[in-house]
């Protein structure tokens, strides 16, 4: 359980041993105390997932969000996902994942680029739409924010995608309308 939390973005029920979630159910508080004492972090345990959220001074391997242009884009994409859930357009399952058609997910990415692309770094701003969609999806999959299933043409959005969101400051948004 420790290794899964330390070396991945999150743990999800159904991916790995069910005993891991039973362990969290009974020993989660003690595990949280151990991790919080040894690292600057917090353990977030939910019904179908658990996350090891690092503090600003904690540097254990690669972290998300990084100080990169793609991290900014992914944070804004996570905000778009949250908007769709809050509006009722996308509905979470019992395990807090969201299953959406691949075309709907890709349309959301295109909409994000159209609305916010002026603020992206040059490489992403000038990138063709199809390449932008592929790169954003690949990066989201790398950080286990989503899982694409080409066979069923669906995207599973993991709960971690709703934990962090980003947007441009209001003064920037108003200036670029």
Question: Where do the model's predicted regions map?
Answer:
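Short, cationic-aromatic polyanion-contact patches
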Residues: 152-176
């Amino acid at each position: 359980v420790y290794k899964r939390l330390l070396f991945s973005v999150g743990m999800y029920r159904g991916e790995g041993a069910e005993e891991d979630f039973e362990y969290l159910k009974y020993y989660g508080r003690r595990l949280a105390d151990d991790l919080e004492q040894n690292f600057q972090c917090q353990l977030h345990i939910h019904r179908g997932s658990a996350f090891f959220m690092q503090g600003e001074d904690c540097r254990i391997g690669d972290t998300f969000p990084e100080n990169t242009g793609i991290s900014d884009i992914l944070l804004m994409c996570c905000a778009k996902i949250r908007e769709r859930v809050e509006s009722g357009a996308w509905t979470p399952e019992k395990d807090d994942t969201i299953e959406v058609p691949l075309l709907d997910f890709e349309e959301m990415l295109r909409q994000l680029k159209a609305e916010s692309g002026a603020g992206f770094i040059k490489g992403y701003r000038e990138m063709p739409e199809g390449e932008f969609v592929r790169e954003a999806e690949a990066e989201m999959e790398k950080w286990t924010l989503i899982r694409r299933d080409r066979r069923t043409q669906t995207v599973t959005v993991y709960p971690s995608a709703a934990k962090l969101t980003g947007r441009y400051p209001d003064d920037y948004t108003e200036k670029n309308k």
